């Protein structure tokens, strides 16, 4: 199973605003009519019950949403970029890798249709109609669209099953699963026959439930030995486990303790999963002879044990009755409470066009960091004297010069704002 992948996602860039003036016969002073740029497309992850692995991402690692279109004349706003919805299997956990290398879990898509926003598209830039003032009736300024977000993303698929069958390699997990369900796992008499988790549906009169065989766990699996890390994480998505033991083993209870220890060392919460213990191969004469001894040993440890044969089906129905009983209790406990007084979240848009700035002292002058103004500079012809004059007026209206003087700047010093160099 292809159940872990690293991809790169990028939301769409915002379209740039337009510098345009109304040109119409008999309207000599039409004024500015440049439209705003469209917003870039967002990137979403959505759980889809029709998908079962992350194989679709094996050969396509980069996923981009569409950019917003640039603004146009006649106050026409550019089209927003189309959103990108990336479909993933139910049970996918998405983790963002920050620039500093730290990882942050973004979402756990545990149900069909679950959707989460991964990267918001860049906001479209403002057209020159937004820069009209009493002193500037013909603005030559427009704003470049914001760039979209770009992230490294780790997708991990964890099984979602009601019951997991765990145990040492070659204890009969595949045989038991194939006996109880229509699943067809690979069955052979050697360790690690099953190399990926296999799921099947158990049908009973009181209902159905999903059962998964987790490939064999061995000592030091929590350190990645064998196929440990690949499979231990799947157990976290199950309600309970059938701990299957080999009745012909020298010490079945010791085998159980070692596997449970691996669960605890990987994730302490896994060792708290409800377990039903079953000893397989009761059809073997040796196991029949040891049955009373094993029953007493497990009883002393406070454990109820079921003896079964995955080969002949002996004892399996009794085991299933116990599993179904425990499962019904767990499902009832997990049922959501019907609350009417739920908090309603209100989402409000961020203020558009807010132009804050930050001043930094340099060796040979000052730097003014003003993202919104820098987007205007980036989109403007700063070699044009009229454009430069209008930018300076804009900086003055934002009290940038006043703040520079207050910070200690003196007349004649060089100021850098984006790609524009100017002097106080």
Swiss-Prot record:
EC number(s) recorded for this UniProt protein: 3.6.5.-
Cofactor(s) this protein cannot do without: Mg(2+)
This protein's GO CC annotations: cytoplasm
PROSITE patterns registered for this protein in UniProt: G_OBG (PS51710), OBG (PS51883), OCT (PS51881)
Localization per Swiss-Prot or TrEMBL: Cytoplasm
InterPro entries: G_OBG (IPR031167), GTP-bd (IPR006073), GTP-bd_Obg/CgtA (IPR014100), GTP-bd_prot_GTP1/OBG_C_sf (IPR036346), GTP1_OBG_dom (IPR006169), GTP1_OBG_dom_sf (IPR036726), OBG_GTPase (IPR045086), OCT_dom (IPR015349)
Enzyme class, broadest EC rank: hydrolase
Record: residues binding Mg(2+): 174, 194
GO terms classed as biological process: ribosome biogenesis
Positions annotated to bind GTP: 167-174, 192-196, 213-216, 280-283, 309-311
Domain OCT: 349-424
Cited function: An essential GTPase which binds GTP, GDP and possibly (p)ppGpp with moderate affinity, with high nucleotide exchange rates and a fairly low GTP hydrolysis rate. Plays a role in control of the cell cycle, stress response, ribosome biogenesis and in those bacteria that undergo differentiation, in morphogenesis control.
Recorded family membership: Belongs to the TRAFAC class OBG-HflX-like GTPase superfamily. OBG GTPase family.
Quaternary assembly: Monomer.
UniProt protein name: GTPase Obg
Source organism of this protein record: Dehalococcoides mccartyi (strain ATCC BAA-2266 / KCTC 15142 / 195) (Dehalococcoides ethenogenes (strain 195))
